[in-house]
């Protein structure tokens, strides 16, 4: 299975509309975000779990008071349990029901390109930082995917670029250690996330990057 150049594949989740397209090169600009679809030495696809959910982060950025939260109920299913408890603590009225204690904010590892960096140097730096220096890169793949994500909750569009990255560590090397990175709380196998809304399109990304020529 493969994806031809400029062919677009669309996925939709309750929160996102994602366009995936194979391209030749990653543009270099101050706003370029690059991500690595990491494969362990024993063949497992890796994914990161954010320390803070995007929904809670957005709510915090919009608040004018430290004591009052105004929250749309449609956001609640996309937050961590501790974040919901904080919202509940500040509620003047209403209640929070149907909490999912197993929610995780899954993301590909990577980040924003520094203008002085190459694409691969940026990914090496980001992987080192986000794993507390546990991940080292063996080699990168040659296939590049452009990911265009429309966040339906906040009506925003994000563009990123992704390539495969084969690392020197096994899944066991990474799964039994604590991470203290400010953004990432855990690195785990994507195979353990089959019930997540993002699993289908993340699996597709990994399959395209690993199997395409």
UniProtKB/Swiss-Prot annotation:
Entry keyword set: Hydrolase, Magnesium, Manganese, Metal-binding
Catalytic activity: a 5'-end (N(7)-methyl 5'-triphosphoguanosine)-guanosine in mRNA + H2O = a 5'-end phospho-guanosine in mRNA + N(7)-methyl-GDP + 2 H(+)
Superkingdom: Viruses
Binding of Mg(2+), residues: 117, 126, 130, 151, 183
Active site: 126
Motif (Nudix box): 111-132
Protein's UniProt name: mRNA-decapping protein OPG121
Species in which this protein is naturally found: Variola virus (isolate Human/India/Ind3/1967) (VARV)
The gene coding this protein: OPG121
């Amino acid at each position: 299975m493969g994806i031809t150049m400029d062919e677009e594949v669309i996925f939709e989740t309750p929160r996102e509309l994602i366009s995936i397209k194979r391209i030749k090169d990653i543009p270099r600009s101050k706003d370029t975000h690059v991500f690595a679809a990491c494969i362990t030495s024993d063949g497992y696809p890796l994914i990161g779990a954010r320390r803070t959910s995007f929904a809670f982060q957005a709510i915090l950025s919009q608040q004018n008071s430290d004591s009052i939260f105004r929250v749309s109920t449609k956001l609640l299913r996309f937050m961590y349990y501790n974040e919901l408890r904080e919202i509940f603590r500040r509620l003047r009225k209403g209640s929070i029901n149907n909490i999912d204690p197993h929610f995780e904010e899954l993301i590909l590892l990577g980040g924003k390109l520094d203008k002085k960096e190459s694409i691969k140097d940026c990914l090496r730096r980001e992987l080192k930082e986000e794993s507390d220096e546990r991940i080292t890169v063996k080699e990168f793949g040659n296939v590049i995917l452009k990911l265009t994500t429309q966040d339906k909750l906040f009506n925003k569009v994000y563009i990123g670029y992704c390539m495969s990255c084969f690392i020197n560590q096994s899944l066991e090397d990474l799964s039994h250690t604590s991470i203290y990175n400010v953004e990432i709380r855990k690195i785990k196998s994507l195979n353990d996330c089959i019930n997540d809304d993002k699993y289908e399109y993340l699996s597709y990304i990994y399959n395209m990057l690993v199997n395409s020529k």
